[in-house]
Every structure is written in structure tokens, then in C-alpha cells.
Amino acid sequence: MSSFCLSKHLILVPILVMMAQLLLIRNVLSLNMNNPYLYHKCSANQGEYKLGSLYKKSLDSGIQQLSKDNEVFRGGFVYMDHTDPNGTLRVYITFQCRGDIYGSHCRSCFATARAELFKRCPRDKAAIIWYDQCFLEFSSISTGGKINYDDNICIDTARARPNAKTHTGDDSVLEFLRLFENLTNIAVTKRNNFVKDVEKPALYAAGEKRFGNKKIYVMVQCTHDLTPRACVECVNHNVRQFQDCYEDKPVGLKKGARVLGRSCNFRFERYPFVNAKTSPNYLKF
């Protein structure tokens, strides 16, 4: 009887191990699907660091300090000016989660971005990487409070269908631009009720609006080191600069697009892509 129980347990152990492995793989795949890698840029302008150098030690120390700061992941943003032990060399680190992402999800995105950025830009003194839920940048030059247009990029997520009867023509583009203007104004005037003891505007807003018989979902966000005025300037510049990103002439508005940037970004799709329940300033127009 005891030998039968023992053999039964021996059979169950590998099955349980296999089930645990499958569950782990499923969770990893789910994370990658919900938070896909978008783009990265290794900056050659600031040169490279050597392994064991003061810059590398300062960078590692700053990243390690950031990873332990729970307030960063509660609030979803940090701009860090970190010096080496001698106080002679500075590293500037910027990290921000999408406006609806907080806590463990924000921390998870940071861990993913950190590992991947060091893999893709192993020796660069300056680099930036974007995921769907966050971005991470480090630099040897101060970037805080300044609008950076150099690292902007458009990602056209879908093409417009020429035979579509809705969402086409100049009227839809103009309506889309008015929607973005309204959303930006909300982002720079309304605070984030999900983050305590922060009185400044959220610099984030999202929402949805019906165009014809379908809906369009939109989001705009600026980094928290910008002033509200600088946020408006950044968004307006990118809307003008990347007109081809969201407009498919002469058809009209594309089905979806996003503009990534160090200082501000915006996105629109024909499907929901943010969590309305955790999004500050989520509106239905």
C-alpha cells in the first residue's frame, strides 16, 4: 500500500512541475502581450563608458536606488540627478509609467525596461527605451525640465481603409484635432486624484469619443518635470510635426497611431488601450 502511494506521488511531482512551468510561461507571455516593447535609441553623441568606470558605478547605483523607492512606483514618475561617491560625476535618470499604471505594474515595467535597455545599449552613456506602459532614460547631460524633440518617433499602428464610410475626410481630422486640444487642456489643468499629496496637474488625460457609428480612444501624457505650459507646447509641436502619422491624405484619419517622445506622447486607436478605472481625467466626450 505504501509503495503504491509512493509511486503515485512520484508520478504527480513531474506533472505539478510541468503545470507550474506552463503557468509561468503563460504569465510571462501575458505580460509581454500587455506591455510590448516599442522602440529604443542608443545615443552616440555622449560617448561610451567603460566597465568599472565611475560613470558605470554611478549609473548602477542610481538605478538600484530607484528600484527600491516605492514612492516612484506609486506616483509613476521620477527624474533623478545622481552623483558618484566623490560627487564629481552626474548621471540623470528619467522614468515614467503611463498615467493609468501604478504600483506593481509600474515596478514590473521598470524592471523590464532596465534589463532590456542595458542589453540593447550596453556601453552608451545615454539611452532611452519605450514600452507600452513606461519609458526609461539615462543620460550624462541634464534633461530635466527641458522639452526634448530629438528622440520623438511615430508608430503608425494601423492604416486607414480607403473604402470606409466613417472616420474619413477632412472633417474627421479636424474633429480629432479639436479632441486632442480639449484633452491636452484637461491634462494641464486637472490634478491626479489617484496620487495623494500632489497638487500639480496630472499632465495626463485619456478618453473616448464617438465618430459616426464607431468610437475613437485617445491619450495624451507629458513628463512631470515639465510645466503645464511646456506640456502644451510639446504636444502641439508633435501634433504639427507628425501630421502624416495620424492623417492618411486624402482619405482622412488613420485607424490608429502613436507618437513617442522623451517629453510628451500621444496615442489614438479604435479600441480601448488604457484602464479607464485607473486613469486620472478619463472622459467620455
Curated annotation (Swiss-Prot):
Residues 37-143, 161-273 form the Gnk2-homologous domain. Residues 1-30 form the signal peptide. It holds the Pfam family Stress-antifung. Keywords: Repeat, Secreted, Signal. InterPro entries: CRR_secretory_protein, GNK2, GNK2_sf. It comes from the Eukaryota. Its main location: secreted. Gene3D superfamilies: Gnk2 domain, C-X8-C-X2-C motif (3.30.430.20). It is found in: Secreted. The keyword Nuclease does not apply. One of its GO terms (cellular component) is extracellular region. Belongs to the cysteine-rich repeat secretory protein family. This is Putative cysteine-rich repeat secretory protein 14.
